[in-house]
């Protein structure tokens, strides 16, 4: 439900050319299917092997530093505020730190198969097992492959990498809601998930109080402070808080900014059969067919006499 990245343990990655540290923020906050990891790499380090997921989409967001996004043998410069989308079954990819080091959030949409291809290791992850099954783990094979060959950075970046300031902000203003939304994931071509950079005005709400029937969401507070309204409870939040909202909890949520405003990343899966309920107004949104209506909540036995 709620965690703070200062309280989540770091795991050191030390496998030959794979170096860095990782936090499993999504699991710490109670995510069910979706994933969120934070990778911190010193200058020149690479914490993850070159890989591509069979059915899982990833969105990276650079918190601090600079480096290179390696994609299918090409390299692209990335820096703080960049969003990088890796669609399922697309190019093999990894990310490397530059001279300043690199701090990256990696969101993942969840997998039904657990299949991941590591081309340099010439191996597959198959959930907790791997192929070839009679050899070392894919991580060991990746380490044995040695340092990743790095070409010179390309002069232009692909459409799957966008800088937050280059994405237009869409205002959301009505009643107590006053916020600006930058749809970073959509701008970078995400299909199975979405990510927004949300700036909430001081004292205002980010969006109406709501809960999801099918989509899972993860929020990361990047700056400012405020309050998380969760059902009948309220919890203070500030920079570094991570909030996971699995689907079908029946518990609505809302962010309310404090005096300094609130900036957060709002990531979520995309489901065509999504249903959203707004308790404050008793509305239901059938997103797949674009129909909204007001409902009266009843007891199971109402009208059954």
Residue ranges, per PLM feature:
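Short acidic-glycine-tyrosine-enriched beta hairpin
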Residues: 73-90, 232-248
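A short, N-terminal "cap"/entry segment at the start of jelly-roll beta-barrel domains
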Residues: 1-33, 43, 116-192, 202, ...
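Ligand-binding loop in jelly-roll beta-barrel domains
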Residues: 74, 88-114, 247-274
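Conserved short histidine dyad/triad with adjacent acidic residue
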Residues: 18-22, 37-53, 177-183, 196-212, ...
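Short, conserved beta-strand element in jelly-roll/cupin
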Residues: 38-42, 52-71, 109, 197-201, ...
């Amino acid at each position: 439900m709620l965690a703070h990245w200062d309280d989540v343990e770091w795991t050191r990655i030390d496998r030959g050319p794979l170096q860095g540290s990782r936090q499993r923020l999504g699991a710490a906050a109670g995510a069910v299917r979706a994933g969120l990891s934070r990778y911190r790499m010193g200058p020149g380090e690479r914490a993850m092997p070159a890989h591509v997921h069979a059915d899982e989409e990833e969105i990276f967001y650079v918190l601090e530093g600079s480096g290179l996004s390696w994609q299918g043998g090409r390299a692209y410069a990335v820096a703080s505020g960049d969003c990088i989308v890796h669609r399922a079954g697309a190019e093999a990819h990894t990310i490397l730190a530059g001279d300043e080091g690199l701090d990256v959030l990696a969101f993942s949409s969840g997998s039904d198969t657990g299949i991941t291809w590591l081309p340099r290791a010439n191996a597959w992850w198959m959930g907790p097992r791997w192929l070839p099954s009679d050899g070392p783990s894919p991580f060991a094979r990746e380490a044995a492959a040695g340092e990743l060959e790095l070409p010179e950075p390309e002069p232009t970046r692909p459409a799957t990498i966008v800088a937050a300031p280059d994405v237009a902000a869409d205002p959301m203003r009505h009643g107590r809601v006053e916020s600006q939304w930058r749809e970073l994931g959509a701008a970078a071509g995400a299909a199975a998930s979405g990510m927004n950079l949300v700036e909430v005005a001081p004292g205002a709400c980010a969006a109406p109080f709501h809960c999801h029937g099918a989509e899972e969401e993860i929020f990361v507070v990047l700056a400012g402070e405020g309050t998380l309204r969760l059902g009948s409870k309220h919890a203070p939040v500030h920079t570094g808080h991570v909030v996971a909202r699995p689907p079908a909890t029946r518990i609505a949520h809302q962010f309310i900014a404090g005096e300094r405003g609130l900036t957060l990343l709002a990531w979520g899966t995309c489901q065509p059969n999504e249903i959203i309920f707004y308790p404050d107004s008793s509305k239901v949104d059938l997103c797949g067919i674009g129909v909204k209506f007001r409902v009266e909540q009843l007891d199971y036995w109402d009208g059954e006499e």
